[in-house]
Amino acid sequence: MIDLTQEKQEILIKNKFLAKVFGLMSIGLLISAVFAYATSENQTIKAIIFSNSMSFMAMILIQFGLVYAISGALNKISSNTATALFLLYSALTGVTLSSIFMIYTQGSIVFTFGITAGTFLGMSVYGYTTTTDLTKMGSYLIMGLWGIIIASLVNMFFRSSGLNFLISILGVVIFTGLTAYDVQNISKMDKMLQDDTEIKNRMAVVASLKLYLDFINLFLYLLRFLGQRRND
């Protein structure tokens, strides 16, 4: 009876941690969606960002800096600061993602977002419930991720449609798998953390960022297949 009660308590603690992670991730996605749409409707902001390559690159560099601050320098900042940086990152990502409204129809963007949400939810449930250890699969997926990053950089020069198609397929597969892998790791994270609320809150922000990036990248790769271009 004592063991059963302890097990239930551990499950409740784990679920509370996961709820915090998914809640913060969802807020980040909502902020990104709002900023993406608002930016796409503001001609002045679009002109400032997308007509000047320096402005756009500056935003990208700031985003990389925020990711480092949230994850790499986590021990140097408070959980509240980390949360604020994550929300700022979500807003900036929304601004840079506003370009998709110039390329694809609004209907196809909404449709792809729905497909992404369904896929993400399914893989999250799988990652949480499966008894299979996904560590080995995760290692291959991370290697594959580096592979498509390198291939994407190479294709910036060669502009091969065949390679671009292959990268898109691999991107969908990799981020679908990474969603399950990350959720499984996050579901185990609470056991490894000390009974320190501040540390748990910091790690919840990092976990939210991981899942946020999985979702955004899966969405962008699916959009390559499901998005209807405005000039079609």
Swiss-Prot record:
Membrane topology label: Multi-pass membrane protein
A Gene Ontology CC term for this entry? plasma membrane
Membrane spanning stretches: 17-37, 54-74, 84-104, 107-127, 138-158, 161-181, 203-223
Q: Which domain of life is it from?
A: Bacteria
KW rRNA-binding (keyword) present: no
Quick check: keyword Cell cycle in the entry?
Answer: no
Q: What keywords does the record list, in alphabetical order?
A: Cell membrane, Membrane, Transmembrane, Transmembrane helix
Tell where it localizes. Answer: Cell membrane
Provide the protein name: Uncharacterized protein BB_0539
User: What does the sequence similarity comment in the record state about its family?
Assistant: Belongs to the BI1 family.
